[in-house]
Amino acid sequence: MIDSLDLVIDTIVAREVLDSRGNPTVEAEVLLEAGAIGRAIVPSGASTGAHEAHELRDGDSRYMGKGVTKAVNHIEDRIAPALCGISSLDQASVDGTMQELDGSDNKSSLGANAILAVSMATARAAANGLGLPLYRYLGGPMASLLPVPLMNVINGGAHAANNLDFQEFMLVPHGASTFRESLRMGAEVFHTLKGLLSAQGLSTAVGDEGGFAPNLTNNDAAGDLLIQAIEKAGYSPGKDISLALDVASTEFYKDGCYAFGGGSYTSTEMVNELEKLVDRYPIISIEDGLAEDDWQGWALLTKKLGKRIQLIGDDIFVTSTKRLQQGIDQNVANSILIKVNQIGSLTETLQAIDLAGRSGYTSVISHRSGETEDTTIADLAVATRAGQIKTGSLSRSERVAKYNQLLRIEDELGTQALYAGATGQGPRGRS
């Protein structure tokens, strides 16, 4: 029998490690009284929303200013003394203590990267102390739904040095009957796409998230290539595999207009352009179709397309219950992207997912472009029954690590495992 005292936090250590772009990030280890340990590494984004929690960097000559020794020191000098002696099972108390210690609105004092590393490591330590997998510890007995992957196979925008304006062109294999099958379908299309690019003399080098980053004439050319790859791989576009976009429109929004593809568009014109894409391609999800503070544009987009497809708010919501509630009140979007480092604690992340679910919004658990071998988000997707996950392409080990963890979870669940695509709990379908 496990003694509750065994699950009390005894020691917390931190270190500076590297992410998938070669930039420093924070790793934390939480050791419990009985010896159980939890380790977590935080990710980092390239296209970050202005309203995200503050990622603390050193700003000195090391690593071109991107070192995180300040955040590491905050963990060992300030956070550890405050948390030692607290039960690892009380996640809300652990996270609340760190937020009070920080004292700012956006975690700029201690750094969201410091707080999140400890938050995630604490949950994993508690799970290990109880002898439970993380998804079961966080989600309880109902944690059995495997997510539909949104696979970013063509990278553009801030994620690639090419001429594509939109940031992500994704495959959505919702027609599979299991997660394992969905992964195979995506991999087969990925390799087929590589062959098509190579045959046209286009680059098959990959971007930050493992997708190809070719120079194409325009965004439509990317859509055409994906349809061709899906069909050549033996699948039916829209039935077996649909498409999803991350427009990341904040990146090209300036002075009230959207500048891309050689043109300049008002919010209304931008909505019309997106509607044309939905009419032309089997697109079932669009992320950040409008900029992070273009609330009126977002409302129009939702009115026009909200009943046809999933409209994900990333930069506009930044995993914040406050901003999500504002969106709910204004009928903006119908889905929220969940990035743990946008808000900076596991407790607040779970609160955002809960609010979304109670309000009829879907949640899409997401990686960042600067990732690591940490697989917490895979467990989080199953724990929360989110039904969707964005964790990159079918290459680069920091992306594949999450897919492999989901395969392990599916195997462990056995006959209890459900695939969100097969149960209708994945992305919203087309009407």
UniProtKB/Swiss-Prot annotation:
PROSITE patterns: ENOLASE. It holds the Pfam family Enolase_C. Its EC number is 4.2.1.11. Keywords: Cytoplasm, Glycolysis, Lyase, Magnesium, Metal-binding, Secreted. One of its GO terms (cellular component) is cell surface. Mg(2+) binds at D246, E287, D314. Pathway: Carbohydrate degradation; glycolysis; pyruvate from D-glyceraldehyde 3-phosphate: step 4/5. It comes from the Bacteria. The active site is at E209, K339. GO terms for molecular function: magnesium ion binding; phosphopyruvate hydratase activity. It is found in: Cytoplasm; Secreted; Cell surface. (2R)-2-phosphoglycerate binds at Q167, K339, R368, S369, K390. It catalyses: (2R)-2-phosphoglycerate = phosphoenolpyruvate + H2O. InterPro entries: Enolase, Enolase-like_C_sf, Enolase-like_N, Enolase_C, Enolase_CS, Enolase_N. One of its GO terms (biological process) is glycolytic process. Its cofactor is Mg(2+). Binds a second Mg(2+) ion via substrate during catalysis. Belongs to the enolase family. Catalyzes the reversible conversion of 2-phosphoglycerate (2-PG) into phosphoenolpyruvate (PEP). It is essential for the degradation of carbohydrates via glycolysis. This is Enolase. It comes from Prochlorococcus marinus (strain MIT 9303). The lineage of its organism: Bacteria, Bacillati, Cyanobacteriota, Cyanophyceae, Synechococcales.
